[in-house]
């Protein structure tokens, strides 16, 4: 803990870091993450499910004195939608904004900036031209990555080969869909036969 580290830092001839107040990251509906209680999702597991920019956005958009509720289920779609909306429509016209709106706009810009893995990159590159929701649908109805890329080319979402960012997003999406955290109400089932109820 921080308090235990203070004397150790001084013993080793260093100064302890400044104390920063922060709250817990909680798994939605499960309470604070705790290795002793088994309520955890490790960073590598989280990164195998969620694009790093969206995972960073979950943290960057939160106030440091409030706990972060990390929902690996259906709310992840809403978080991704929010991130994609802010990236696609950056705030430009600030002349007629109130002071409160200006603060909110600056906070949103800061959250997007801190969400980027490479600070020099264009945030729109992280989306790859395809929304999180649309990619989840394609990942479920197309069995191969090549079929997904063909579909995206036909629909005009991409031209030619997909970006590395989009390839990574699809791999993570397939991992999320195949894992325990994907929401049941977002799962698609393709039937091979027409049932009697559909006739």
Placement of each model-derived feature along the sequence:
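A broad structural signal for alpha-helix termini and local helix breaks/kinks
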Residues: 12-13, 50
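Glycine-rich, aromatic-lined ligand/substrate-binding cores of catalytic
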Residues: 1-11
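Short acidic, glycine-rich loop/turn motifs
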Residues: 11-12, 27
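Catalytic adenosine-cofactor/nucleotide-binding cores of aminoacyl-tRNA synthetases and other
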Residues: 2, 22-195
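Beta-sheet entry/capping signal
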Residues: 15-19
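A generic secondary-structure boundary signal that marks alpha-helix termini
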Residues: 13-14, 67
